[in-house]
């Protein structure tokens, strides 16, 4: 069973929502809202690749997906429904523009035009900054386009305002950005 254009995936840990946190051996529900995009599961396991796909992603790899992939919605009559990505038996279609990174069993790799930047702590200054240095970070996961421009993973970079789209990957806060959101190498 393969789709002509989409990956077929299952929710990582078989849960559509990532709204339970363990604290001191006790599970706490952090959100009961199905509309809360921050509580939706962002990780998927690849069940099948698209027909004639020849890229680096294989069955069993993990994908970092858009928050709408696994979400439930209410239809016009208030009935709970799965979103457009739902296929069947807890399987979902993920199109090429619905995932941002993949884990090949060794490391995370940015997909297509996406890159990931790790924010850095605020530098000492007479100007108050909230915890992170504004518009500055370390390129954590680059892409081929950035590499061709000479921007390498580990470079301290500056990025456009309002381009920060936060994800938590392996316990680390990262901003998902597009290649053209990177403004300079510092």
Language-model segments: residues:
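Acidic-enriched and Gly/Ser
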Residues: 1-186
């Amino acid at each position: 069973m393969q789709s002509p254009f989409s990956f077929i995936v299952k929710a990582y840990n078989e849960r559509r929502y990532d709204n339970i946190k363990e604290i001191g051996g006790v599970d706490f529900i952090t959100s009961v809202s199905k509309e809360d995009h921050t509580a939706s599961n962002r990780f998927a396991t690849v069940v099948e690749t698209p027909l004639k796909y020849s890229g680096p992603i294989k069955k069993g790899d993990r994908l970092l997906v858009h928050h709408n992939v696994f979400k439930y919605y209410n239809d016009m009559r208030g009935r709970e429904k799965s979103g457009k990505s739902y296929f069947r038996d807890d399987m979902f279609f993920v199109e090429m523009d619905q995932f941002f990174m993949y884990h090949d069993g060794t490391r995370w790799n940015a997909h297509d035009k996406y890159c990931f930047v790790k924010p850095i702590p605020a530098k000492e200054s007479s100007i108050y900054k909230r915890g992170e240095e504004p518009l500055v970070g370390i390129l954590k996961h680059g892409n081929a386009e950035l590499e061709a421009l000479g921007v390498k993973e580990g470079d301290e970079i500056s990025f456009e305002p309002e381009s920060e789209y936060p994800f938590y990957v392996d316990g680390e806060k990262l901003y998902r950005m597009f290649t053209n959101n990177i403004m300079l190498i510092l």
